[in-house]
């Protein structure tokens, strides 16, 4: 009898052992919860002293109901720093799934979890480089999803040495360099996606020759190899003799010397020819930071001393000249190629070229049409001066007429220029400076305070404002093939209240056709790429790109001439919608607004309708704007 009772006691003890172990596993999970911020939903079911495997802990998976084997916490807006030390106390943890959150910073040291089999971190904001030996201590990894983050540097060689790796998704990052070869010991890899990075070189034969491997490399312009049907350039032979190398070096030196002499002579001749022509130049390196100033230099003919009795009359003359059509200024009439500033909009006051010359300027950047500078006038007015090249299709009088027309535009979402300066070789267009800069900067810049203010409500306000501005331009310039022609996030400026103002519009008639096709974003629409045609529907395509850019938070690769970097937002969106995965497109930073998911998805669908490859399948601007206006918070 005693033996029977003892046996029963042992059975009872063993039956409680897993439960006690489970309770002990609750502590590291609760510490993990406390280490991160949760902006969407909660993890209230995670409580110390309770069993994580009781089926009530959200996102916790257990092995045979006895020990924690997986953490699946997605779309909760998690941010902060993951403490891997807490997770080390979960000896049977095999899967970590934290995709579609707001996690940022360097990739945490998951290599401290040697038993890990699945690491799924898609659609976060992890950044920085990954050490080459990062995955050396995680030999059991089978699935690694790091796609759509901001990771950079080279792909870790240790990752491609995992013999059991079955799926690897790293698309939509900023990885560079060559793809490491896949270990010969790996016979199970079935899915590899490295698209939309900045990789280069030949795709390793250990990958390209694999059968039954689904692989994607699109969006890496410098990759080559059989999967892409792009031949690789032959590498130069390294077996040449020393004499051959010396002869080659001498030949190269002679060619360079000749070119330098030739360029020096050309520069002297050009300078001599231009001595008699007055010139407006903003000196400074094209890539100076915003904090560096540049000198504004004018020719001596402009900088004549002005006695005090004439200062007022000259200033008034500038204002009057601004209101005149003929544009006569300090350098003469239309035929001279050099005049004063011509005012087309005096709402912010009037100024002349000398006023602009006295202002210290800052380089803002270079665009497809030229460079931009910020200048602060003596009266405190901050302006942007755009120095535009190749805008020489129209004669002087026709150009003046167009600029006067721009100056009369009035709409809360359209930036009206203040003034312009005419030269045969280049034009200056002056407009009001917007302190919050462009939508491009706020979305993808330093991700500071302005970026943090891009809530769902603010993004909807921006999209609807851009749509209204485009509707206005399509009415004002209805006879133009491209009422805007260059709509992109860098040409959408933001006021203090995030009211968008569209700039750089209706330039097509001012540009030579070959310059327009290289400088204007509408010429990247499918109809021009395929059939060399543009229409107002091309503006609809550009609006769609902006809608999707704002809603996903991704930088479109379509903006880049080389195609290197960014996300192929057209392919990504169309593919996700076809698979009914629209919610996965939403920027995690606004996806926490669960009450508005339907409205966000509707806006994504409108954006997708704008980018249809066939322009006949796109609605016109007015219809698209009407749909956008119907979206509410």
From Swiss-Prot:
Any S-S bridges, and between which cysteines? 53-62, 224-232
The residue ranges flagged as biased composition, category Basic and acidic residues, are 294-314
Instruction: Using the record, list the residue span of the signal peptide; answer none if the entry has no such feature.
Output: 1-19
Please list every transmembrane segment annotated in the UniProt record, as residue ranges.
Answer: 249-269
Record text on activity regulation? The phosphorylation activity is calcium-independent.
What spans are recorded as compositionally biased (Gly residues)?
A: 328-338
The listed locations are: Membrane
Q: What is the lineage of its organism?
A: Eukaryota, Viridiplantae, Streptophyta, Embryophyta, Tracheophyta
Catalytic reaction(s) noted: L-seryl-[protein] + ATP = O-phospho-L-seryl-[protein] + ADP + H(+); L-threonyl-[protein] + ATP = O-phospho-L-threonyl-[protein] + ADP + H(+)
What name appears for this protein in its UniProt entry? Pollen receptor-like kinase 3
């Amino acid at each position: 009898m005693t033996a029977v009772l003892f046996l029963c006691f042992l059975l009872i003890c063993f039956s409680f052992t897993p439960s006690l172990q489970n309770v002990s596993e609750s502590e590291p999970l609760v510490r993990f919860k406390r280490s991160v911020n949760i902006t969407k939903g909660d993890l209230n079911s995670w409580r110390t002293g309770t069993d994580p495997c009781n089926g009530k802990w959200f996102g916790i998976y257990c092995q045979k109901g006895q020990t924690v084997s997986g953490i699946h916490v997605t779309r909760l807006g998690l941010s902060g720093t993951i403490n891997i030390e807490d997770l080390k106390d979960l000896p049977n943890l095999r899967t970590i799934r934290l995709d579609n959150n707001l996690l940022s910073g360097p990739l945490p040291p998951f290599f401290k979890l040697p038993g890990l089999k699945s690491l799924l971190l898609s659609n976060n904001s992890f950044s920085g480089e990954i050490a080459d030996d990062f995955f050396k201590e995680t030999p059991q990894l089978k699935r690694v999803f790091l796609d759509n983050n901001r990771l950079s540097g080279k792909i870790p060689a240790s990752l491609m040495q995992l013999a059991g790796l079955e799926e690897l998704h790293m698309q939509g990052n900023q990885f560079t360099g060559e793809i490491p070869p896949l270990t010969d010991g790996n016979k199970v890899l079935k899915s590899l996606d490295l698209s939309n990075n900045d990789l280069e070189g030949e795709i390793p034969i250990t990958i390209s020759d694999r059968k039954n491997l689904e692989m994607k490399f699109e969006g890496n312009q410098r990759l080559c190899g059989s999967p892409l049907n792009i031949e690789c350039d032959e590498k130069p032979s390294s077996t040449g003799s020393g004499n051959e190398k010396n002869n080659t070096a001498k030949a190269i030196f002679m060619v360079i010397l000749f070119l330098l002499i030739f360029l020096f002579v050309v520069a002297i001749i050009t300078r001599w020819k231009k001595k008699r022509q007055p010139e407006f130049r903003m000196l400074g390196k094209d890539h100076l930071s915003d904090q560096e100033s540049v000198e504004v230099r004018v020719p001596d003919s402009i900088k004549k001393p002005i006695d005090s009795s004439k200062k007022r009359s000259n200033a008034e003359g500038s204002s009057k000249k601004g209101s005149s059509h003929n544009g006569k200024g300090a350098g003469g009439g239309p035929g001279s190629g050099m005049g004063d500033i011509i005012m087309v909009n005096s709402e912010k006051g009037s100024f002349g070229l000398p006023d602009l010359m006295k202002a210290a300027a800052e380089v803002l950047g270079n665009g497809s049409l030229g460079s931009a500078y910020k200048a602060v006038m003596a009266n405190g007015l901050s302006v942007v001066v755009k120095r535009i090249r190749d805008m020489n299709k129209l004669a002087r009088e026709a150009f003046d007429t167009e600029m006067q027309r721009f100056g009369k535009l009035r709409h809360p979402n359209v930036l009206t220029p203040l003034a312009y300066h005419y030269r045969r070789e280049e034009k200056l267009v002056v407009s009001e400076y917007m302190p919050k800069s462009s939508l491009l900067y706020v979305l993808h810049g330093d991700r500071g305070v302005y970026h943090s203010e891009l809530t769902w409500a603010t993004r909807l306000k921006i999209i609807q404002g851009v749509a209204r501005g485009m509707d206005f331009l399509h009415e004002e310039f209805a006879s133009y093939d491209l009422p805007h022609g260059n709509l992109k996030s860098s040409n959408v400026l933001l006021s203090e209240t995030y009211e968008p103002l569209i700039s750089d519009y209706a330039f097509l008639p001012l540009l030579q056709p070959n310059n327009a096709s290289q400088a204007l974003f509408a010429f990247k629409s499918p109809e021009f790429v395929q059939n060399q045609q543009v229409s107002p529907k091309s503006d609809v395509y550009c609006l769609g790109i902006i809608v999707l850019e704002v809603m996903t938070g991704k930088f479109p690769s379509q903006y880049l001439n080389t195609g290197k970097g960014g996300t192929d937002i057209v392919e990504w969106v169309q593919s996700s919608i076809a698979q009914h995965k629209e919610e996965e497109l939403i920027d995690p930073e606004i996806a926490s607004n669960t009450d508005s998911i339907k409205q966000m998805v509707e806006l994504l669908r409108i954006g997708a309708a704008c980018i249809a490859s066939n322009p006949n399948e796109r609605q016109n601007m007015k219809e698209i704007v009407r749909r956008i206006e119907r979206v509410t918070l």
